[in-house]
Amino acid sequence: MRITTVILIVKLENCGKFRMGHSKADKAANHDRIVQAAAARFREAGVEGIGVADLMKDAGLTHGGFYRHFASRDDLVTEAIERALREGSRAVAAVATIKECPLNALVDAYLSTAHRDDVVTSCAVTTLAADVARSNDRARSAYTRQVGEYLALLTRLIAGDKQKSRRTKAIAALSTLVGAVSMARAVNDDKLSREILQSAADELKARFG
């Protein structure tokens, strides 16, 4: 076998390996785009508010490619819920790093009209609660873990000496945060919506700040 033939074979093999690696990278990137699009749209329209075809279109992909990434729509729903929860967690944790009155800063950010109105990137603990309640165990477990992380964070931020007492207050605070935003979004009276947010914020800061 001539040297040039050997070189050609090696080049072809390397080219095939490159294409294979490139294909895997493309598939992973496309998978991520689908999950990201779903995480945003599910928060905006609800899990049942948008179909696979529209989600794939949002991701810039064809409907026919969906099942190369997911065995079922439920698999996508679960991954998207997990993604949305992680994104919300990072945002809340970032606010809580403010050195001066971190609890008050978190309350103000969570109960702001900006958070109320920005459903697409908002905290999924509030936005997807009803959807998760009707979802599978994996999604509910992810939601439960996120609630646990928020409670741990609030327990650290709330003043007091006794761990049990601070955890009880943390549960009350988180329930108020989630409930106030949900109600503020649901009413069609902007003045009342703002009153709900402000009253909840004032009460939380007075009790726990």
Where are these regions (language model features)?
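Short, intrinsically disordered or compositionally biased N-terminal tails of bacterial proteins
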Residues: 1-22
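Helix-turn-helix
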Residues: 33, 37, 41-75, 79
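Hydrophobic alpha-helical connector segments
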Residues: 79, 93-122
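Short, basic, alpha-helical segments at the C-terminal edge of helix-turn-helix-like DNA-binding modules
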Residues: 82-87
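Amphipathic alpha-helical segments used for helix-helix packing
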Residues: 103-106, 117-144
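Short alpha-helical scaffolding segments that buttress acidic/His motifs in well-ordered protein cores
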Residues: 110, 125-129, 173-177
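Hydrophobic/aromatic-rich alpha-helical bundle segments in the mid-to-C-terminal region
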Residues: 137-145, 158-209
